[in-house]
Structure formats: C-alpha cells, structure tokens
C-alpha cells in the first residue's frame, strides 16, 4: 500500500496528540514533532508504522527511538537550555546521529545542532538526508563519547545511547549552566539523567528509566565487534 502525505500528516497529528496526553507539554517540542516528517527518517519497510509509539531498527544494531522517548529527552533539554519561557536557542551537541530524526527535531526547535555518529554508513546516510532536506545540521564521524572539543562549549548535550557513566569529556564540553541529557545505567536499563554544569561542579537530577542501545566508545561501553571508523 502506497501511503500519501495526507495520510502521514494525519498520523503525525495523532502522534502529537498522543504525546500531549502522555505528559509532553513543552510547546516548542510539540511544534517540532508536528513539523518534522518522521516517516522520512524511517526505513522504507517501516514507513507505514513511522508514527506508532515504537522504536524501529535502522540497521547495524541501531534503532530510531520511539517518539515518546525522543520527546521526553528533548523536553528535558528544552526546559533547561537555556531556561525561561521563550523559544529555546543555543548550541547543542547530539551524540549518536543514527537516523537523523533527533537532530532534525532539535533543529526545528531552534537550536544550532552538532551531531557525532560512530558508524560510517549511518553517518553518510544522515548527512545526505540533512543536505536533501535543507537542514543546517553539522555532523561528523567519530567517537561520540569524546564529544566535539573543537566546537565546544555547548549549551546543551543530548546523548542518544545508554552510557555506563557520564563521560568526562562530554561534561567538560558543557558551557557554564549548560545541561546534558544522558541515559546512565547498565546495558539493559538506564536512568534518564540531567547533568548541569555549575562552575567546577556538576548537579544531577534523575528521571524515568529507559532502555537504549549501548553508548560505545572510549568513555562508554567497549564493543570490539563494532567498527568505529
């Protein structure tokens, strides 16, 4: 069955309504989810289910996270970076470009987005999508656990994979009062954590439990079976 843009538009509105019913209230986040066409970031075979609240495999052991998870993380970031009631702005680093959907959501909100992906195929696919859709997102291939020191500091960092601990390199790349949203825990379950820089100190708040693919890299999980570059 060939889906039309009208059908996708209706499904996207229903997805946003569902997010709102499930507690996502940030207006800028909801607006971005209405604007960004998620079906363009899902593999062809999954497009009919692009607006279901479910993760979908994108290859190489990676997934595009379910909409609620993306909205939850994005809301945490948007509520704290830069803070206040106006439209969010600032420089945000995303770790784990994956399908490119999370980066597109951040860009739609109003952030200047930098994104690091460790898997070459996913990096090139996402970069091509950003170019095709005219999205001014800067991305690079590399070890996301080390961040992007040449572009630091960042007002916000969003980590789209589960970490065993908070990577020191990422914390050091936060601007003063900047915040990082990162799932921290074991390989099976992580606690969504908000880390905020206050001078030489880092304050933490913990939220709901989630299950992410592992954050692989020098300051993350070791995975010798995965090609990094």
Swiss-Prot record:
Its EC number is 2.1.1.77. One of its GO terms (molecular function) is protein-L-isoaspartate (D-aspartate) O-methyltransferase activity. Belongs to the methyltransferase superfamily. L-isoaspartyl/D-aspartyl protein methyltransferase family. GO terms for biological process: methylation; protein modification process; protein repair. NCBIfam families: pimt (TIGR00080), PRK00312.1 (NF001453). PANTHER family: PROTEIN-L-ISOASPARTATE O-METHYLTRANSFERASE, PROTEIN-L-ISOASPARTATE(D-ASPARTATE) O-METHYLTRANSFERASE. It catalyses: [protein]-L-isoaspartate + S-adenosyl-L-methionine = [protein]-L-isoaspartate alpha-methyl ester + S-adenosyl-L-homocysteine. This is Protein-L-isoaspartate O-methyltransferase. Catalyzes the methyl esterification of L-isoaspartyl residues in peptides and proteins that result from spontaneous decomposition of normal L-aspartyl and L-asparaginyl residues. It plays a role in the repair and/or degradation of damaged proteins. Pfam families: PCMT (PF01135). It comes from Chlorobium phaeovibrioides (strain DSM 265 / 1930). It is an enzyme of class 2 (transferase). HAMAP family: PIMT. It is found in: Cytoplasm. The active site is at residue 65. The keyword Transferase applies. Keywords: Cytoplasm, Methyltransferase, S-adenosyl-L-methionine, Transferase. InterPro entries: PCMT, SAM-dependent_MTases_sf. GO terms for cellular component: cytoplasm.
């Amino acid at each position: 069955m060939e889906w039309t843009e009208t059908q996708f538009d209706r499904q996207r509105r229903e997805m946003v309504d569902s997010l709102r019913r499930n507690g996502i209230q940030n207006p800028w986040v909801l607006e971005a989810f209405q604007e960004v066409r998620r079906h363009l970031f899902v593999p062809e075979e999954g497009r009919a289910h692009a607006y279901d609240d479910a993760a979908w495999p994108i290859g190489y052991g990676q997934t595009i996270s379910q909409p609620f998870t993306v909205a939850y993380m994005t809301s945490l970031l948007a509520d704290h970076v830069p803070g206040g009631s106006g439209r969010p702005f600032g420089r945000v680093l995303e770790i784990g470009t994956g399908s490119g959907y999370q980066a597109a959501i951040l860009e739609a909100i109003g952030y200047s987005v930098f994104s690091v992906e460790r898997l070459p195929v996913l990096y090139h696919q996402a970069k091509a999508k950003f170019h095709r859709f005219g999205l001014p997102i800067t991305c690079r291939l590399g070890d996301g656990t080390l961040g992007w020191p040449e572009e630091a500091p960042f007002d916000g960092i969003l980590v789209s994979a589960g970490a065993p601990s908070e990577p020191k390199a990422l914390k050091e790349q936060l601007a003063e009062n900047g915040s990082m949203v990162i799932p921290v825990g074991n390989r099976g379950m992580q606690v969504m954590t908000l880390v905020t820089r206050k001078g030489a100190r880092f304050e933490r708040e913990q939220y709901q439990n989630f299950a992410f693919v592992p954050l692989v890299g020098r300051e993350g999980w070791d995975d010798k079976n995965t090609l990094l570059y």
